[in-house]
Amino acid sequence: QISSGRLKRSQWIERWGLDVARGMHAEVVEAFDVFRGLIRDHAIACEPQDGGHYYIAHRPWMMPTLTKEAALLRETFGYGARMLTRDELHATAVRDREAHGAMWEPDGTAVHAAKLAFGYLRVARELGAKVHVDSPVEGWTTKNGVHHLRTPGGTVRARAVAVATAGYAPRGLHPQLRDRIMPIMSNSIVTRPLTASELDACGFKVTSPLTD
């Protein structure tokens, strides 16, 4: 999904202005290109389902809102979002009986998350990075410009530290993490591969992301 948080592009403009919003949009578009390049150039077999993102309207009042947002994406950001009616959504993407329509965005990819993570691990090691598993950072102090990261196996010293923990780093680990990241519960259901008849019964016609 071509997004950078919960706010829509119109809300970006309201909060930070058009120039910043355009810069953020360009950054997200670039991130998709980088992602596609990484999995292509390094042969990361993460089963990408690259067919765009469907933002489904499950309430009638959402359709005018999404219609305005799609127009903004096209006219202000030069991005090819478009609207689908209920019938178009049913015919081309998913037979969702509660849907009133959807906004489709060209960028949206579903992946096998574990295969992607292990692919990144392989690539990092091939490029010379040292990866130490089972070594959580339990304490972080900074002295004279040097970071000291305490782990169960010893202390790592570094001039620079990149935090790549999503929203699940302890809030007290470092002052700059406090109130800047938010863990959000995500419930996932995994099934065996569905048969063609099961997919038809569920109404799925695409394997790309569907959200509301």
What are the residue ranges of the model-derived segments?
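A conserved short coil-to-beta-strand element within the FAD-binding core of flavoproteins
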Residues: 84-96, 129-147
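Extended non-membrane alpha-helical scaffolds
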Residues: 114, 127-130, 141, 164
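Flavin-dependent oxidoreductases
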Residues: 139-212
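Rossmann-like flavin
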Residues: 12-123
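Short coil-to-beta-strand
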Residues: 1-10
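Hydrophobic side chains in beta-strands
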Residues: 2-3, 58, 105, 190-191
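General beta-strand structural signal in soluble alpha/beta enzymes
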Residues: 48, 82-85, 131-133, 150-151, ...
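Secondary-structure transition/capping motifs at alpha-helix termini
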Residues: 123-130, 197
